[in-house]
From Swiss-Prot:
It is found in: Cytoplasm. GTP binds at residues 19-26, 81-85, 136-139. Monomer. Belongs to the TRAFAC class translation factor GTPase superfamily. Classic translation factor GTPase family. EF-Tu/EF-1A subfamily. InterPro entries: EF-Tu_GTP-bd, EF-Tu_GTPase, EFTu-like_2, G_TR_CS, P-loop_NTPase, Small_GTP-bd, T_Tr_GTP-bd_dom, Transl_B-barrel_sf. It comes from the Bacteria. It comes from Streptomyces ramocissimus. Residues 81-84 are annotated as: G3. The lineage of its organism: Bacteria, Bacillati, Actinomycetota, Actinomycetes, Kitasatosporales. Residues 173-175 are annotated as: G5. This is Elongation factor Tu-3. Residues 60-64 are annotated as: G2.
Length: 389
């Protein structure tokens, strides 16, 4: 059976749900797909299909980043259901790096929790510029309490530069919408309308040389190695030569798909699978970058502006000094690096500082690129590359 080709009829955006564990992100994602399937513009993806890995189903939490797709009247969305479990926030960093906007899910019953704040901070650091709030479980909450939670959330958004007063806050119930309750089905439609109108079409860097950070690597028996990820910039077609940075090899793209549909050309913003000719499965891994040959040079040393999280934001309680060796999350790569704070020598929690970083291995870098700094399973800093040195 031949597959139906992907036809680009509407602008494409990448959107994600984020928020604290058990506030209902995955249920809400399932509800969105159900409401749209009933409108005829998508396929219903049940809750247990979004939480894909068996270990997650057992624990009831989302670890890997799960993608679903759907369409509203005006747009085509790839929707990322992001992990809410603290150990796995690093996965969120790489997922958030490709988002055009986000739906922050906050339980109307519990209000802001530690991860709610951490996710908002991370979203800001990795360049998510627009957040729409879904106050979930609103069917079960007391209205006055829900009003207070809304004020809290607006304050949190304002604290991180998201203009909390103007951000849409929609009261929803993912569970009731899944059960088909008309009032709460309408709330999901209102949420999607808010996303359609509040999250602008981003500028896509279609004219720049092709670049795709590798998220996952798979093997298709008899056909070869497939890499998946979101195209950061440029375009790619079947037959194009590409370079895999990190693996040190050049190859040709022999197949191109999005959500299981073949496509002629992928462009910035698309979530794609690339079939690569003659590349051994173990030669490529998450964190590598597929790019137009010669368009990027991997480097290991750079200067950066870094914000060191305060203890209140879940960061360190003690200062960072030169010689500190945390993990740097850059695109989909996770690399240890040495920090040099120069004459200042010390960076206290809550401060923004300049530093020189020497990574343990070379990765494609350029000024303006955002990254997160983590140690012991928590985010301790977030920064931007200022120059290659």
């Amino acid at each position: 059976m031949s597959k139906t080709a992907y036809v680009r009829t509407k602008p494409h955006l990448n959107i994600g749900t984020m928020g604290h564990v058990d506030h209902g992100k995955t249920t809400l994602t399932a509800a969105i797909t159900k409401v749209l399937a009933e409108r005829g513009s998508g396929t219903f993806v049940p809750f247990d299909r979004i939480d894909r890995a068996p270990e997650e189903a057992a624990r009831g939490i989302t670890i890997n980043i799960a993608h679903v797709e759907y369409e509203t009247d005006t747009r085509h969305y790839a929707h990322v259901d992001m992990p809410g479990h603290a150990d796995y926030v690093k996965n969120m960093v790489t997922g958030a790096a490709q988002l055009d906007g986000a739906i922050l899910v906050v339980s109307a019953l519990d209000g802001i929790m530690p991860q709610t704040a951490e996710h908002v901070l991370l979203a800001r650091q990795v360049g998510v510029d627009h957040i729409v709030v879904a106050l979930n479980k609103a069917d079960a909450g007391d209205e006055e309490l829900t009003d207070l939670v809304e004020l809290e959330v607006r304050d949190l958004l304002s604290e991180h530069g998201y203009g909390g007063d103007g951000a849409p806050v929609v009261r929803v119930s993912g569970l009731k919408a899944l059960e088909g309750d008309p009032k709460w089905t309408a709330s999901i439609e209102a949420l999607l309308d808010a996303v359609d109108t509040y999250v602008p079409m981003p500028e896509r860097y279609v004219d720049a040389p092709f670049l795709l950070p590798v998220e996952n690597v798979l093997t298709i028996t008899g056909r070869g190695t497939v890499v998946t990820g979101a195209v950061e910039r440029g375009t790619v077609r079947v037959g194009n030569r590409v370079e895999v940075l990190g693996a040190g090899l050049e190859t040709v793209v022999t197949g191109l798909e999005t959500f299981g549909k073949p496509m002629d050309e992928a462009q910035a913003g698309d979530n794609v699978a690339l079939l690569l000719r003659g590349v051994p499965r173990d030669a490529v891994r998450r964190g590598h970058v597929v790019a137009a040959p010669g368009s990027v040079v991997p480097r290991s040393r750079f200067s950066a502006q870094v914000y060191v999280l305060s203890a209140r934001e879940g960061g360190r309680t003690t200062p960072v000094t030169s010689g500190y060796r945390p993990q740097f999350y850059i695109r989909t790569a996770d690399v240890v690096g040495d920090v040099d704070l120069g004459e200042v020598g010390v960076a206290r929690p809550g401060e923004t500082v300049s530093m020189i970083v020497e990574l343990g291995r070379e990765v494609p870098l350029e000024p303006g690129l955002g990254f997160a700094i983590r140690e012991g399973g928590r985010t301790v800093g977030a920064g931007t590359v200022t120059a290659l040195v």
